[in-house]
């Protein structure tokens, strides 16, 4: 059948205030999405597009009319606020729109006036969807929503009309054009539909009756994929098949890339859309979303892919502590998931235990990644200034048996402070891995290589009497990696001295990690890096400079400079959580990946991706819209750098100007050789009291507040 429709709720309301001119214009530029307008009527019967019947929730009305607060019955519920029925359209000329969801950027607030329905229908060249949420409310004020909608449908092309009120839709039957689809909008199952006095859950059980007055239904997405109380998916319902059997189209609502998705989707909104259109069992007829670009990607480029296909071509997908977005860092489960998800390279951050065993652990401080703070070893916490200024319990304070038998892993939560927690059911799942365990696991897997990251080599040599370079080489040799060529061994470090030592002793692929944000590398520093490294890893901000989560109009030459010197470039650190991405990437990890690897123009042109979520990056490599040249769909082109900032009207709201990033110089790269391994033991830390924090779930209201404070 036809591809599912994409309906832009209030335009591109995930970026701009819902129902604003830039929201509609931006969505209309996508061409393939319909424009949704929530119709409200003014005192003089003019239609405006507004997402909320309470104008104070989405406009500056209360500032202009501070005494305008009223209380009315809305579907039988006493509701207090500012209402469009109290104002003539001319009164609203200077009222401007605000974001309706506080966790979104406020930099577009107060800059755009209300859009009348006639303007929305005539100016934005896209299919039109008019939603009438409260017909019975307007009738209290002698305003006929029915007459207004019929008038609009005669003057303009209206493709869809929806309402949660059965009587309103029935009043339109036979009075609108044959091409206009009438759609019954379902609210939560327990709410009562006002004209039938039945709950929406009851109406759902008699879909055949809906066919007499509507061609389709619009349901909240949880009607199709319900979730548990702790936000995991339950088995899908039969509602899609039931609707189709009744001859009804079915549209799913409530999609937004920056909402809390089910943990099954690993914070990947594209994966959620695919669950509704490409699951092998059913496909909805449309998706109502605040971010129309992501479902367009899903439909146009990511449907019907063979996700099991191995593809070790560019961009190289390198895990970061395994699939650490789904399981605790560097555990057996994280590595298994990374391989399962199609990583090309899996990685191990090497630390050392008290008994001299190299292990895979993302931090040298066990407080960061294990349950040591609540164990019998918490009393060993202390400060070692060579490593960090706050107290920690370090891997070299405990033996391997201490760690493996008494501690549990702890999943990383980079955005836990705003309740974007990772996979809480598995927060302590998995087993720790020695380097030897990691090598044995990786060998024989469908990988192009492994990456071993080595930091603190000087400290280990001087203060612990441990030669980590020699230990890594021995472990690699003992595992048989030196006698095979199917998987290459990569060594990554921020220290040139460490890589120089490896180059002297073994033939590995050496990756220099540039751990500061730089715009370019001086020719002399490039020549120096080439002496000891085969590739470089750089931060995302070095590729896409940003200010306050907006891309700035600046293209850094760093990637091209490194590549011109013969150094492939891997970018770190990719995460799926929307809070990790500038707004220009639409709260969509796939959009960010696409921009980073795109060659030419506004693209980053990198050769590899270091990511907590290798499954998202691997799926990108398989998409059907790659290598299309001039025929690449517009939604698969990278954003214009600084383009979104250019839409900000209020100069006071502009992100602060950024100081120029430095250029990487020889002095940044050059280091003295690694010191010889001393005959010593681990230093005794200076003890300090340790505060143990307990993670407590935060309510949705607090989440919104915290998120807004971080913008």
Report residues per predicted region.
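Phosphate-group recognition and catalysis centered on beta-loop-alpha active-site segments
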Residues: 1-711
């Amino acid at each position: 059948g036809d591809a599912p429709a994409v309906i832009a709720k209030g335009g591109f309301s995930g970026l701009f205030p819902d129902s604003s001119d830039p929201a509609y214009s931006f969505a209309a530029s996508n061409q393939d999405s319909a424009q949704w307008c929530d119709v409200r009527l003014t005192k003089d019967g003019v239609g405006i597009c507004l997402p909320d019947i309470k104008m104070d929730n989405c406009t500056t009305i209360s500032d202009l009319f501070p005494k305008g607060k009223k209380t009315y019955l809305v579907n039988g519920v006493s509701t207090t606020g500012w209402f469009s029925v109290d104002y003539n359209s001319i009164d609203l000329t200077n009222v401007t729109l605000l974001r309706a969801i506080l966790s979104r950027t406020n930099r577009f607030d107060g800059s755009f006036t209300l859009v009348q329905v006639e303007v929305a229908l005539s100016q934005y060249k896209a299919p039109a969807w008019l939603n009438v949420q409260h017909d019975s409310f307007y009738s209290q004020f002698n305003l006929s929503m029915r007459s207004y909608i019929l008038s609009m449908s005669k003057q303009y092309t209206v493709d869809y009309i929806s309402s949660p009120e059965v009587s309103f839709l029935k009043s339109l039957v036979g009075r609108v054009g044959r091409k206009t689809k009438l759609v019954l909008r379902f609210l939560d199952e327990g709410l009562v539909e006002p004209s039938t006095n039945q709950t929406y859950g009851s109406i759902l059980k008699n879909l055949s009756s809906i066919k007499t007055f509507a061609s389709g239904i619009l349901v909240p997405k949880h009607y199709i994929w319900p979730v548990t109380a702790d936000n995991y998916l339950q088995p899908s319902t039969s509602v899609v098949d039931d609707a189709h059997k009744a001859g009804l189209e079915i549209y799913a609502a409530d999609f937004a890339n920056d909402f809390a998705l089910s943990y099954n989707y690993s914070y990947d909104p594209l994966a959620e859309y695919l669950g509704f259109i490409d699951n092998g069992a059913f496909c909805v007829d449309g998706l109502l979303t605040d971010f129309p670009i992501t479902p367009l990607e899903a439909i146009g480029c990511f449907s019907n892919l063979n996700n099991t296909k191995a593809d070790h071509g560019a961009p190289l997908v390198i895990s970061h502590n395994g699939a650490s977005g789904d399981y605790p860092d560097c555990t057996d489960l994280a590595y298994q998931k990374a391989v399962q998800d199609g990583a090309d390279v899996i990685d191990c951050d090497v630390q050392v235990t008290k008994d001299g065993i190299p292990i895979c652990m993302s931090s040298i401080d066990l407080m960061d990644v294990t349950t040591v703070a609540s164990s019998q070893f918490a009393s060993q916490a202390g400060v070692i200034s060579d490593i960090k200024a706050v107290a920690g319990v370090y891997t070299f304070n405990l033996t391997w048996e201490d760690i493996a038998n008494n501690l549990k892993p702890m999943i990383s939560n980079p955005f836990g402070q705003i309740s974007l927690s990772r996979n809480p059911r598995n927060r302590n799942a998995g087993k720790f891995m020695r380097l030897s365990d990691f090598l044995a696991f990786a060998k024989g897997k469908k990988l192009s290589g492994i990456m071993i990251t080595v930091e603190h080599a000087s400290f280990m040599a001087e203060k612990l009497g441990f030669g980590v370079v020699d230990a890594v080489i021995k472990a690699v040799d003992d595992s048989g990696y030196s006698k095979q060529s199917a998987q290459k061994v990569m060594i990554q470090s921020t220290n040139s001295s460490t890589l120089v030592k490896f180059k002297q002793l073994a033939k590995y692929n050496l990756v220099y990690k540039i751990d500061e944000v730089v715009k370019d590398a001086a020719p002399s520093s490039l020549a120096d890096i080439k002496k000891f490294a085969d590739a470089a890893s750089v931060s995302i901000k070095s590729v896409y400079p940003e200010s306050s989560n907006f891309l700035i109009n600046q293209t850094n030459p760093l990637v091209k400079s490194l590549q011109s010197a013969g150094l492939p470039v891997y970018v770190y650190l990719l995460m799926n959580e929307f809070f990790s991405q500038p707004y220009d990437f639409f709260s969509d990890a796939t959009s960010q990946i696409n921009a980073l690897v795109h060659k030419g123009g506004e693209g980053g042109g990198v050769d590899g991706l270091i990511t907590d979520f290798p499954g998202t990056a691997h799926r990108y490599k398989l998409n059907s819209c790659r290598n299309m040249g001039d025929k690449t769909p517009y939604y698969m082109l990278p954003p214009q750098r600084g383009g979104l900032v250019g839409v900000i009207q209020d100069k006071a709201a502009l992100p602060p100007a950024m100081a120029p990033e430095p250029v990487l110089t020889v002095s940044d790269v050059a280091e003295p050789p690694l010191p010889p391994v001393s005959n010593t033991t681990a230093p005794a830390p200076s003890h300090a009291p340790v505060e143990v924090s307990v993670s407590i779930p935060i309510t949705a209201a607090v989440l919104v507040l915290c998120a807004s404070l971080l913008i």
